Amino acid sequence: MTEQNLLSSLAHMISEQRNPNSMNLDSLSPLELVTLINNEDKQVPLAIEKVLPQIAQAVEKIVRTFQQGGRLVYIGAGTSGRLGVLDASECPPTYGVKPEMVVGLIAGGERALRHPIEGAEDNAEQGKADLQQINFSKKDILVGIAASGRTPYVIGALNYAKSLGAITISIASNPDSAMASIADIAIDTLVGAEVLTGSSRMKSGTAQKLVLNMLTTASMVLMGKCYQNLMVDVQASNEKLRARAIRIVMQATDCEKEVAERFLKAADNNAKLAIMMVLTNLDKQQASVLLQRHQGKLSRALSQ
């Protein structure tokens, strides 16, 4: 794209407009600044509320993908890419899933998580190449993230995924974007102009984070990764999470700390299995078989 064409494109993007509420930004006091930012941030959940049906549709597709052995892959550049990597990295400790179940890719690779990589987002072919590097297939589902909706790296990845027959989802902060025209499901979080003109790490980034939270949380809940509202598949990999696992067993079964610790030890620190054992008086093997029979969904297993 020529510089003139890019300037014309940016001029029409909501995320690149000047916000009339912040025209005097450089003359505000600290309290006035943070009050303004906070007031603008209040628009984010309202914008997301308008696309909840599309988010729910995406969750249904993600769950079906997981059930069929596929992966959820996020791809983006800059803030968008970092948020995808962040959400993906939280899934193993929270839900006890393998790291490859939810994958985050960022333009420029690992170094781009901490440092800007010049020109990385402009390479559409690299988006395709990065998917090929992880053996992306039509069994997987791709979520392309970019506030602008036009990032070449993400568009290249979406086009490649589409060519394979994979389901594609876009998350953007501008309407009628190039990404939305490619994706099977377009999630357009129209949060309006940023307080600092063009700084899409702000409201647009906040909207992306909230949507990603919804996608993985709702999908994992539907996959049986929680009981009531407890993260029963938590991996007790550090002191805080070990304490949380004990509390989860206590909360789910109304047992004492010593009982929770004893059953967790018998269940190899598997909180879900420990809860099953406490509530049913089954041994580890019997409880495990019953859980497997119900696809790991504790509520269903307990109802038998």
Swiss-Prot record:
InterPro entries in alphabetical order: Etherase_MurQ, Glucokinase_regulatory_CS, MURQ/GCKR, Ppantetheine_attach_site, SIS_dom, SIS_dom_sf
Family membership noted in the UniProt record: Belongs to the GCKR-like family. MurNAc-6-P etherase subfamily.
Lineage start: Bacteria, Pseudomonadati, Pseudomonadota, Gammaproteobacteria, Pasteurellales
Subunit composition and interactions: Homodimer.
Assigned keywords, A-Z: Carbohydrate metabolism, Lyase
Enzyme Commission (EC) number: 4.2.1.126
GO terms of molecular function: carbohydrate derivative binding; carbon-oxygen lyase activity; ether hydrolase activity
Enzyme class: lyase
Keyword Lyase: yes
Identification of the protein by name: N-acetylmuramic acid 6-phosphate etherase
Pathway: Amino-sugar metabolism; 1,6-anhydro-N-acetylmuramate degradation; Amino-sugar metabolism; N-acetylmuramate degradation; Cell wall biogenesis; peptidoglycan recycling
One Pfam family recorded for the sequence: GKRP_SIS_N
Protein task: Specifically catalyzes the cleavage of the D-lactyl ether substituent of MurNAc 6-phosphate, producing GlcNAc 6-phosphate and D-lactate. Together with AnmK, is also required for the utilization of anhydro-N-acetylmuramic acid (anhMurNAc) either imported from the medium or derived from its own cell wall murein, and thus plays a role in cell wall recycling.
Domain SIS: 62-225
Protein encoded by which gene: murQ
Disulfide bonds: none
